[in-house]
């Protein structure tokens, strides 16, 4: 019984190796090999892809040559911590003053119960 099963496993392994070799014959020999583009193909690609055709190295060089963009206004006056806290507390108190005393919160709670 061992003879036919060993023979079947060997045949399947050989078939697997041959199929892998057959499929890899169409693959390029070297991955680092660059394609020799004709000038006409270069123009086509540049038109089809726009600025995305520019190589990554030249794009990185352009970004490195540019000065970093200013993100802050140079004349910005920063608030101190007590000033920021006072401004925050004033903004919290402001809506309570605008509400007045005529707002009934029980109506809001009743409406919420119906939508559960």
UniProtKB/Swiss-Prot annotation:
**GO (cellular component) term, any one:** dense core granule
Q: Does the keyword Signal apply?
A: yes
- Signals that turn on the gene: Up-regulated by enucleation-induced adrenocortical regeneration (at protein level). Up-regulated by dexamethasone (DX) treatment. Down-regulated by adrenocorticotropic hormone (ACTH) treatment. Up-regulated by hypoxia in the carotid body.
One GO term (biological process):
positive regulation of gastro-intestinal system smooth muscle contraction
Q: Which residues form the signal peptide?
A: 1-26
Assigned keywords, A-Z: Amidation, Cleavage on pair of basic residues, Cytoplasmic vesicle, Hormone, Secreted, Signal
Positions where Glutamine amide occurs in the chain: 49
Q: Which domain of life is it from?
A: Eukaryota
Subcellular localization is given as: Secreted; Secreted, Extracellular space; Cytoplasmic vesicle, Secretory vesicle
Region Disordered, as annotated, extends over: 56-75
Protein name, per record: Spexin
